[in-house]
């Protein structure tokens, strides 16, 4: 079963212009999905529909097999949400916020206390659990907001610009925590951001959206293959046969166009199995930013498609 299924989803606020236009996505369980696009592209509208905050104009969406819009209370039990504007109750402590939201989710008191201890420790907030949020830095408030989204142990986590307002170090720390928590608890993450560098660090699956339309969907390698992007494998070694399709560039350097990561292991294995020596391997590939602009603008690094 996929975690999220979206079919021909459309939303118009004025009956004329579509904020999102026939979006279709199928996201398997356990993926960290990066929904990437510029401001106003339709990312937040999509998340709000999936969370039941907005109704769609047409189309269908399911979360863990449950139809979005039919029983939003049930969906809220399995989903956690952290948006760009997520805020805590400043007059409450970090722990007080978690108690409040945990009880809202109907958590049993003993389980709630255990969960609070776990999350505060995991997010490095134990030392400030009894301090009011009003005294916290932006980075600490983001961690409290993430803790609130995770308090009821959701199976799906929606994150809309979770690093907004953070300096690079704090942004990286928050995303590292998100990735670790997702892997530890097998949580499916739906991450909306225009911070491509951060998305590249943690995402396993991508969707590119612009002007309400999904322009590309898949893993990095799948998206690159659809644009006929050829990755280059560079190998420095000795006694390497050219029968494996490698071009000898001189000075013990060899190269080969490859389709993705899966091909690299087989090439290295065959070289070594046939008596070759491998000293260094480098895979030269596009950055996520370059690939993104191939879909959004049709160019990357000055190369016109």
Describe the function of each predicted region.
Residues 229-299, 305:
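Short, charged/small-residue-rich alpha-helical element at the C-terminal edge
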Residues 157-161:
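Catalytic Walker B motif of ABC-type/P-loop ATPase nucleotide-binding domains
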Residues 176-259:
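ABC transporter nucleotide-binding domain
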Residues 99, 103, 110-128:
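Conserved ABC ATPase "signature" region
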Residues 153:
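Conserved catalytic motifs of ABC-family nucleotide-binding domains
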